[in-house]
Regions:
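Extended C-terminal regions of large enzymes
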Residues: 1-168
Length: 168
């Protein structure tokens, strides 16, 4: 697949963003169920905001290291965002009013409060995180049925090369 050198893809779909400097986003892009590193799922956009670890700990429950060249500590934010997006999608909530866009917007706490109020059953943020994980796992089962598996969870090889300036 010579073309992949010039047209980077994930799971057969073109990639919309180079994730060399955003490792949580790279993990999310590689493992997203939509392929292509779809910007509407698994994008821990807070990583681009260079928030200190104390701030991300308040938002997602764990500190996120700020080293743009390290994958250390970047898996959980990708999982957290994938689950948040899955729950938001299930509730019909536009991505642009959630923490996907900005840390001050809607998240699991808000979703739990709304779902509890509407259904009369108590939902906790932790329970909704579990719901998001189940949605994600079900989507992964569809991918497996269609012949995709862990070997397809990768960023394009080109994204492992150093940054270059100018036309590449």
């Amino acid at each position: 697949k010579e073309y992949e050198r010039y047209i980077p893809t994930i799971k057969g779909m073109t990639v919309d963003q180079d994730t060399r400097g955003t490792k949580a986003m790279a993990i999310g892009a590689a493992t997203a169920t939509r392929g292509g590193g779809c910007h509407l799922r698994s994008r821990f956009t807070m990583e681009e905001m260079d928030l200190p670890p104390e701030a991300t700990k308040k938002i997602i429950g764990r500190p996120v290291p700020t080293d743009p060249d390290s994958y250390e500590g970047k898996a959980y934010p990708a999982i957290w965002m994938e689950n948040l997006c899955a729950v938001g999608d299930a509730l019909g909530i536009c991505r642009f009013v959630t923490k996907w866009l900005s840390p001050g917007l809607l998240g699991f706490n808000d979703f739990a409060e709304a779902v509890s109020a509407v259904t009369g059953y108590e939902f906790t943020p932790e329970k909704l995180m579990e719901v998001g994980e189940r949605i994600y796992n079900l989507e992964r089962l569809f991918l497996i049925r269609e012949g995709l598996d862990r070997k397809d969870d990768r960023v394009p090889e080109r994204f492992h090369e150093p940054w270059q300036y100018g036309y590449q």
